[in-house]
């Protein structure tokens, strides 16, 4: 008899078929208390869980006594109670490598669109304001040869540094938990403390996961140390930034502009002051959102769940020690 798994995110037909070759698959719309209650017997028997954008906490785990592995269609896993999973020896799988290049593309797009005011001036053209040769009030700022500061030199940070260094001749500063020899050798990147990075960078790109240590890592103090001409980019996790402090820094002119793919609360409230600022490019968490990459992430998540329930955790596992 095939193991039972719960799928709470739609999959392309071929990937669903692959999952069904290995498991009895039960599809649900979400992981809300109502859904769990209505499908209590299914949750009680499930050994695997696959999906994204839902909280997996101790309360849910209490309804799933046979659960052995969870697989998220994402690199981030801050919506999972890792401690509770680990205590139950439940594997948590994620997709850290599939989306690297695509997210780096998004970061570079935010750098370019904020510096060159692409969204703002495009809207002005659509509004009929382009009635003569443009003047300084339409101008942006250069990207090439400007200093890029990267906070978080992981896979995505490396991919961004590659684009910036080779494509735009940008000097690279970085801050991370440890020195990154490859970044220093390939991109002539310079490790520095966070304060120095903030003070010297023309663009500050934040690419950090959300943890207890990174929550509100960026606040009024950090924005106050940046150049008034600096542009802030966040494509990591929204709560790493104190959004009210960011809004205040933009309103006071402490920083020049911001390009944001993530926010403290998502979706972003229509009343957010960020949406009324011409110098803010706000996009709806599109970091990995291309057809090709989202398919690749889903395929990886399916393979991860198959591997996990077969006892293979050589890669893509957040807590591999529970399999020992």
Curated annotation (Swiss-Prot):
Name the active site residues.
237, 266, 285 (proton donor)
Q: Which domain of life is it from?
A: Bacteria
Catalytic reaction annotation: glycolate + NADP(+) = glyoxylate + NADPH + H(+); (R)-glycerate + NAD(+) = 3-hydroxypyruvate + NADH + H(+); (R)-glycerate + NADP(+) = 3-hydroxypyruvate + NADPH + H(+)
Q: Where is the protein situated, by its record's location annotation? A: Cytoplasm
Q: Return the EC number.
A: 1.1.1.79, 1.1.1.81
**A GO term for molecular function:** hydroxypyruvate reductase (NADH) activity
According to the UniProt record, one GO cellular component term is:
cytosol
Q: Which UniProt keywords apply?
A: Cytoplasm, NAD, NADP, Oxidoreductase
One Pfam family from the record: 2-Hacid_dh_C
Tell me which InterPro entries the record gives. Answer: D-isomer_2-hydroxyacid_DH, D-isomer_2_OHA_DH_cat_dom, D-isomer_DH_CS, D-isomer_DH_NAD-bd, Glyo/OHPyrv_Rdtase_B, NAD(P)-bd_dom_sf
- Name the predominant localization: cytoplasm
Record text on subunit structure and interactions: Homodimer.
NCBIfam families named in the record: PRK15409.1
Q: What protein family is recorded? A: Belongs to the D-isomer specific 2-hydroxyacid dehydrogenase family. GhrB subfamily.
Provide the function of this protein: Catalyzes the NADPH-dependent reduction of glyoxylate and hydroxypyruvate into glycolate and glycerate, respectively.
Name of the protein this chain belongs to: Glyoxylate/hydroxypyruvate reductase B
Please name the source species. Answer: Escherichia coli O17:K52:H18 (strain UMN026 / ExPEC)
């Amino acid at each position: 008899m095939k193991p039972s798994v719960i799928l709470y995110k739609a999959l392309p037909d071929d990937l669903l078929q692959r999952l069904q070759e290995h498991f009895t698959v039960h599809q649900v719309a979400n992981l809300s208390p109502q859904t769990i209650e209505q499908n209590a017997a299914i949750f009680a028997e499930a050994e695997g869980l696959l999906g994204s954008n839902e909280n997996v906490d101790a309360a849910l785990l209490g309804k799933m006594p046979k659960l052995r592995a969870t697989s998220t269609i994402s690199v981030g896993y801050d919506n999972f109670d890792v401690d509770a999973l680990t205590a139950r020896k439940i594997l948590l799988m994620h997709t850290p490598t599939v989306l690297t290049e695509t997210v780096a593309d998004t970061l570079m797009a935010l750098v370019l669109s904020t510096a060159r005011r692409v969204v703002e001036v495009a809207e002005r053209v659509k509004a009929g304001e382009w009635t003569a040769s443009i003047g300084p009030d339409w101008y942006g700022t250069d990207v090439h040869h400007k200093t890029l500061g990267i906070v978080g030199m992981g896979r995505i940070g490396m991919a961004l540094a590659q684009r910036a260094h080779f494509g735009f001749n940008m000097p690279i500063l970085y801050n991370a938990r440890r020195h990154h020899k490859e970044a220093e050798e390939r991109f002539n990147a310079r490790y520095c403390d966070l304060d120095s990075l903030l003070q010297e960078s023309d663009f500050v790109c934040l690419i950090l996961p959300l943890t207890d240590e990174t929550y509100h890592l960026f606040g009024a103090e950090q924005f106050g140390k940046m150049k008034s001409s600096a542009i802030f980019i966040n494509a990591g996790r929204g709560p790493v930034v104190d959004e009210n402090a960011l809004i205040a820094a933009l309103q006071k002119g402490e920083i020049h502009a911001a390009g944001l793919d993530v926010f403290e609360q998502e979706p972003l409230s229509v009343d957010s002051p960020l949406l009324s600022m011409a110098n803010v490019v706000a996009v709806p968490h599109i970091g990995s959102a291309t057809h090709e990459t989202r398919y690749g992430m889903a395929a990886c998540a399916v393979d991860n769940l198959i591997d996990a329930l077969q006892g293979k955790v050589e890669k893509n596992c957040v807590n591999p020690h529970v399999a020992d």
